């Protein structure tokens, strides 16, 4: 457990309601996260011309199930992007978009193991519409720990990123969050924080859901890179944004 270097009784009361993990307690979550990314990389390397989005979703589902990571309540999602405009005929009818060499793809899944749920997303090759959003999300991801060390609040940093929305809260790794867990705009107290980000340019959006650890070693993310969840506008038709669960 982390020792609080503060005489603030309110902060101590907050900490009594939450379990603060040691260095090994997060290993199961990180293992599930690594497995999720490994699975998406394998499926991306297996894409073949003629495969539909549904075919690819079934492949991801089967891979997760074979590794005991599948949760029926969290089905994988696949989207093929940047498909050239052409007359729909036969197998190219609406709802049956098929992969062709050079198309972009967005693969999403959740790996669930022993109560730990880790999100993963993989996009490629070169989905240019999302590159700027990815870069800005990565900038925020990299700058937040340094901003917290300087004494800035998360909202002060977010104000420098137009179009960014964020939600964060103290969170245990498993179990139901108690009432009163949301914290205002004051300094973050020690603990494990769940962070959700959404960044939009009006047409496309990207988001992430990840964990920030605050302890006597300073603020730091559990993973080096953001886990992006993506939403694109395909062929001029806006799709409903898929937010982090």
Where are the regions that the model predicts?
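Active-site neighborhoods and metal-handling regions in enzymes and metal-associated proteins
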Residues: 1-245
């Amino acid at each position: 457990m982390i020792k609080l270097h503060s005489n603030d009784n309110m902060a101590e009361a907050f900490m009594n309601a939450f379990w603060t993990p040691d260095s090994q307690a997060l290993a199961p979550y990180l293992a599930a996260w690594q497995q999720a990314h490994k699975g998406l990389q394998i499926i991306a390397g297996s894409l073949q011309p003629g495969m539909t989005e549904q075919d690819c979703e079934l492949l991801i589902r089967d891979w997760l199930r074979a590794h005991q990571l599948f949760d029926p309540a969290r089905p994988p999602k696949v989207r093929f992007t940047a498909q050239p405009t052409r007359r729909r005929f036969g197998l190219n009818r609406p709802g049956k978009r098929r992969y062709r060499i050079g198309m972009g793809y967005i693969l999403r899944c959740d790996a669930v193991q022993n109560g730990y749920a880790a999100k993963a997303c993989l996009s490629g090759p070169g989905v240019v519409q999302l590159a700027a959003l990815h870069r800005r999300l990565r900038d925020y991801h990299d700058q937040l720990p340094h901003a917290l060390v300087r004494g800035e609040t998360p909202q002060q940093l977010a104000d420098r990123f137009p179009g960014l929305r964020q939600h964060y809260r103290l969170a245990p790794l498993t179990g139901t969050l108690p009432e009163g867990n949301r914290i205002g705009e004051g300094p973050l107290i020690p603990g494990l924080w769940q962070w959700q980000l959404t960044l939009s340019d009006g047409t496309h959006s990207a988001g992430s859901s990840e964990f920030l650890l605050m302890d006597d070693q300073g603020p730091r993310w559990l993973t080096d890179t953001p886990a992006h969840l993506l939403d694109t506008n395909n062929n001029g038709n806006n799709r409903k944004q898929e937010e982090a669960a």
